[in-house]
């Protein structure tokens, strides 16, 4: 039986939706605290998304648990389409109809303008997680993103992607 810790990256510098930026000071502190908490779990391998905030989080954790970090392609955050690079206020204004439809809809809707839905994320990410599971290490951590963790958990728990925000997983930065 393998133990896999899915860890959300630390807090980032930008408040813009899904831009590839560094951690802020709080995010670095969060990563260090997560690393200290993970010492007792005796991780054997540490993986991360290729986005800067996940890499920086993993590097700080890796320093704490004395492990190198291996970057994994295709475990990046859900592609938010037209939301990318916009503030919350811009999204609320420009995509009010989409947000309303998404909140009331029973389907797992993709984000507008070429964005992904949860099923798309699962199709992209699960093959990578399965590859990690086939490796020899039994206790691993993967530093990734909130949308990825929610989508993967919804898939594993068979709750349906449309319910991924409702089943009570607290995904504060660096939670696992």
Regions found by a protein language model. Give the residues of each.
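Domain-level recognition of soluble alpha/beta enzyme cores
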Residues: 159-176
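Phosphate-coordination/substrate-recognition cap region in phosphate-metabolizing enzymes
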Residues: 33-100
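Loop-to-helix element that buttresses phosphate recognition and phosphoryl-transfer chemistry
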Residues: 4-6, 10-57, 114-125
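A short acidic, helix-capping loop that chelates divalent metal ions and anchors anionic groups
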Residues: 13-17, 78-83, 109-113
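GST superfamily/GST-like fold recognition
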Residues: 146-150, 175
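Glycine-rich phosphate-binding loop signature in dinucleotide/nucleotide-binding domains
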Residues: 40-42, 132-138
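Short glycine/proline- and acidic residue-enriched helix-loop micro-motifs
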Residues: 99-120
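Generic beta-sheet signal
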Residues: 4, 136-146
